[in-house]
Amino acid sequence: GFLGPLLKLAAKGVAKVIPHLIPSRQQ
């Protein structure tokens, strides 16, 4: 189906965005 790749893309997007939302975690 098409849900699998969609969830993978969403996970990648979230993984990219979260560090920007929580910069303290990067330090």
UniProtKB/Swiss-Prot annotation:
Its main location: secreted. Keywords: Amphibian defense peptide, Antibiotic, Antimicrobial, Cytolysis, Fungicide, Hemolysis, Secreted. GO terms for cellular component: extracellular region. GO terms for biological process: defense response to fungus; defense response to Gram-negative bacterium; defense response to Gram-positive bacterium; hemolysis in another organism. It is found in: Secreted. It comes from the Eukaryota. The keyword Secreted applies. Expressed by the skin glands. Has very weak antimicrobial activity against Gram-positive bacterium S.aureus and Gram-negative bacterium E.coli and stronger activity against yeast C.albicans. Enhances the antibacterial activity of XT3. Has hemolytic activity against human red blood cells. This is Antimicrobial peptide 1. It comes from Xenopus tropicalis.
